[in-house]
């Protein structure tokens, strides 16, 4: 018999999981998401991606500011759910919420736990130069991403991958994994193991929330480190530098790059193809964004703004 589920999620990453749970025939009793927030040029209130998809599917949507009140906890209990599925929801779940569903609460986490517990596992994996990442279905306990693991899938990370690329790879993979986990739970076949028994990176690391102060590119770092920094922050908040354009220092976000040959003082433009010197070697810019403008290929940018040495980026 299909499970009666509560779904809790907010961003685009969570939408495929909601879709897969519905496709697998599970009953979604309620969808919890964050409240609508101002966005866009008009700063109009915009519902979250999960709220929009839930409304499209005809599912009831709740947007509590907290789950710590007795009222909110009683309301969640009233749904009589078998389990809750949590994907990048954004609110802390108190123990009363964790205990409410019959079989507990299950989280889809975008890393190979115990590596990169916390808020920004996708960004941190790319920034650290990890060889692989993945998704895990974990039964939530009182700790920060410390629960027992039910299922996992791995994917390689290449030098060409940005955080956006990895996000788009893991979202559908995780959706399928969670749906299969709930199918197994329905059959009474879901098995949990301790994170230390998963055969993944044994050292616990924490994926701190990305701070915009981290986004400034440091050209005096090694080229591969600069590449990982750029790709790990793409597209948001976007790694940036200042580039001299028509005598003015213009802030540019670099969204995609590749390793390149060349040598010079860190930050020096080495040719007319946006190859920039680092501590050792260089990177070539492939995609960038000026403030207030859409992202564009480097070739298109150079067509309108030709740049040649000598020139230094800060």
From Swiss-Prot:
Catalytic activity, reaction form: L-methionyl-tRNA(fMet) + (6R)-10-formyltetrahydrofolate = N-formyl-L-methionyl-tRNA(fMet) + (6S)-5,6,7,8-tetrahydrofolate + H(+)
CDD domains: FMT_core_Met-tRNA-FMT_N, Met_tRNA_FMT_C
InterPro entries (UniProt xref): Fmt, Formyl_trans_C, Formyl_trans_C_sf, Formyl_transf_N, Formyl_transf_N_sf, Formyl_transferase-like_C_sf, Met-tRNA-FMT_C, Met-tRNA-FMT_N
Annotated residues for binding of (6S)-5,6,7,8-tetrahydrofolate: 111-114
The keyword Chloroplast is assigned to this record: no
Keywords, alphabetical: Protein biosynthesis, Transferase
GO cellular component, one term: cytosol
NCBIfam families membership: fmt
HAMAP family recorded: Formyl_trans (MF_00182)
Family listed: Belongs to the Fmt family.
Function summary: Attaches a formyl group to the free amino group of methionyl-tRNA(fMet). The formyl group appears to play a dual role in the initiator identity of N-formylmethionyl-tRNA by promoting its recognition by IF2 and preventing the misappropriation of this tRNA by the elongation apparatus.
PANTHER family: METHIONYL-TRNA FORMYLTRANSFERASE (PTHR11138), METHIONYL-TRNA FORMYLTRANSFERASE, MITOCHONDRIAL (PTHR11138:SF5)
Protein name in the entry: Methionyl-tRNA formyltransferase
Phylogenetic classification of the source organism: Bacteria, Pseudomonadati, Pseudomonadota, Alphaproteobacteria, Hyphomicrobiales
